[in-house]
Each structure stands twice: as C-alpha cells, then as structure tokens.
C-alpha cells in the first residue's frame, strides 16, 4: 500500500511539531491544525481575506491550515498564521495593520492556543 499524507518534508516536520506542541501545552487547537494539514493538497484550505474579515474579531489570531488568498479586504487588526500566503494577501494584510506569520511562529507566540480561530 502506498503511503498517504503530505510528501513535503517541511510540511511533515511542521505536523510533527504541531502534534508535540498540542501534547506539551494541552492545546487541542494545534492538534486540529495538524489533522487539517494532513489532508491531501487538493483538499487543503484556501481562504480569502474577505472570509477572515467576516469571521475574525480584533486582536485574535486567525489560523489557516492552508493558503491565504488576496480577494477582499481586511479591516480588522488580527494576526494571520498560515501555511502560505499569496503575494497580494501579504500586501493587503500589512496595509491593514495586521500581521502575517507562519504556523511555526504562531506556536512559539501562543503555545496554549488561546484567542485563536481556525478558518477553513
């Protein structure tokens, strides 16, 4: 039987790190993000900024277990953590005064996973 799951070593390492952080910090949010990242690439989340703007609150950390795309506008001050960002999304996030960080940085900044919202 063929192995399933991500073939990218970077993604596999990230999934392992998220699982360890979930156990170490009793933070089920990181376990859920790891499970979502284990999906096939074609089923991975692609989230537009308009959706983040609709569902997030000011000051929250928004986690996207996939790619953030630049459609729409971001009017709230949030921290967006994702596997990857489109160039247009990065520009719009920075112009709105929000922050764009990687998932590794999100685990380091918020190991307990408090005040986070997963958007898929």
Swiss-Prot record:
Keywords: Ribonucleoprotein, Ribosomal protein. Gene3D superfamilies: 3.100.10.10. SUPFAM superfamilies: Ribosomal proteins L15p and L18e. Transmembrane segments: none annotated. One of its GO terms (molecular function) is structural constituent of ribosome. GO terms for cellular component: ribonucleoprotein complex; ribosome. It comes from the Archaea. One of its GO terms (biological process) is translation. HAMAP family: Ribosomal_eL18. This is Large ribosomal subunit protein eL18. It comes from Aeropyrum pernix (strain ATCC 700893 / DSM 11879 / JCM 9820 / NBRC 100138 / K1).
